[in-house]
Design a protein with these regions (language model features):
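Long, low-complexity, Lys/Arg-enriched
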Residues: 1-417
Length: 417
């Protein structure tokens, strides 16, 4: 650990050989980055605990798994910046926060001629911007799961473009605090489109959002976000008209191909565990963006911090700092696939997150746009991971999943029964 802490600067001249300490660090970390797939296979076929094997000198999974993940993502972006000549890389809040921190840490030694920015945007803030006209509200059921909302909670999301009497119009025909189903969601769309949509308020909201976004997207830009359907990037491109290429970890449907925004993904396929389970390790611990006004982005209530996740994030940034301090500009010449560098973290999400004690402290990771389905999905992911290690009979698995859903949505279960 003391050796890793030493500030070992490598000259830019590629002919200068590595010293003993640098070679040792290279063996323990660079080889570590390129052999995760083998560690995963070892656990599958030999019954070994790959996460324990991947820890370096009793480091936590935050250093060995999440640290390598952030390092690999940041190096992927660094290579793309050098190849494509981007003037600016904007990281989208809030799951781009730690990738931004890792990229800036590495760029202190790489010295790429690129600016970085942090754009506060979220599903909740971007949702009203997707309805320039009242007729566009017909796409609302395609943009979010309306059955996870009540009319009251969904009206809260659409408040920036709603008339003063929108609530009264909805309350006259719909129970405001009851979850919507396949029929009532279209009633909500009809009522809000006819009586609740305010075109003037939309114009003002769009003006405020554009005033916030435009200064950040001058010249040839790239954006980074975890994923998954380019909703935010589409809004940004429409409002700013900028030359933007979106970089995301992966997609989970064919929707991004239809949005018209050029994008590149780190993963060629969608991983087994994603969304809330992944994002909680990458999030800025603070408040989500809930909208825009004349002063810029409007923030909501701050999240309750998770000490386990915060410790992993701190350890991960130590890994990035150690790699930057040890190898310097030679990082650009390291030959490894960033996907391999991410494999340990993927394996951790698949098998180790429950044992690590990492839990979702806040059910609403991106404002309120996901309803309360976030916690349900996290519980189901935990159940799936446990069953992968200790398979249960099919009838028991179905009963277990039904019990989780019953605890969060008893009305839907009663309707099905």
């Amino acid at each position: 650990e003391r050796q890793l802490r030493q500030k070992i600067r490598i000259p830019a001249d590629g002919e200068v050989p590595l010293n003993h300490q640098q070679k040792r660090f290279l063996r323990e970390n660079y080889a570590h980055l390129t052999t995760f797939t083998g560690a995963y296979e070892a656990e599958r076929f030999l019954g070994l605990r790959a996460i324990q094997a991947m820890q370096l000198r009793n480091m936590t999974p935050g250093y060995a798994a999440l640290g390598a993940y952030l390092f690999s993502q940041a190096m992927w972006l660094a290579w793309e910046v050098r190849q494509n000549g981007y003037a600016r890389v904007n990281f989208l809040a809030r799951d781009g926060y730690y990738v931004k921190a890792a990229f800036e840490q590495l760029n202190e030694v790489l010295r790429l001629p690129v600016e970085t920015g942090y754009v506060r945007i979220s599903r909740q803030a971007a949702l009203p911007l997707q309805f320039p006209k009242a007729i566009d509200l017909l796409s609302l059921p395609l943009l979010l799961d309306m059955t996870a909302h009540t009319p009251d909670s969904l009206l809260t999301l659409l408040r920036p473009i709603a008339t003063e009497n929108a609530r009264a119009a909805l309350a006259a025909e719909l129970p405001m605090n009851q979850r919507m189903d396949a029929r009532t969601q279209w009633n909500f769309v009809r009522i809000f489109r006819e009586k609740g949509y305010d075109a003037e308020k939309y114009q003002q909201y769009e003006k405020d959002a554009k005033a916030y976004l435009l200064p950040m997207f001058a010249g040839k830009c790239a954006t980074f976000d975890v994923g998954y359907n380019l909703r935010s990037e589409t809004v940004i491109q429409r409002l700013t008209g900028a030359d933007v290429t979106a970089y995301i970890t992966h997609i989970d449907s064919d929707l991004p191909m239809r949005r018209g925004v050029p994008f590149r993904t780190l993963y060629g396929t969608s991983p087994y565990v994603s969304w809330v389970a992944r994002e909680q390790f990458l999030l800025e611990r603070g408040a989500a963006t809930i909208g825009y006004d004349a002063h810029g982005a409007v923030l909501g209530q701050a999240d309750a911090p998770s000490r386990a996740v915060q410790q992993m994030q701190a350890d991960a940034m130590r890994f990035v700092a150690d790699m930057a301090d040890t190898f310097g500009v030679r990082l650009m010449d390291m030959h490894f696939r960033p996907q391999d560098g991410c494999a340990a973290f993927e394996h951790f999400l698949h098998t180790g997150a429950i044992q690590a004690g990492a839990e979702v402290e806040n059910a609403f990771l991106d404002g309120q746009a996901g309803g309360d389905t976030t916690r349900v999905q996290w519980r189901l992911m935990q159940t799936d991971a446990e069953q992968a290690r200790h398979p249960l009979p099919k009838w028991m698995r179905k009963l277990q999943r039904a019990a989780i859903r019953l605890a969060h949505d008893p009305q839907s279960i009663r309707r099905k029964l």
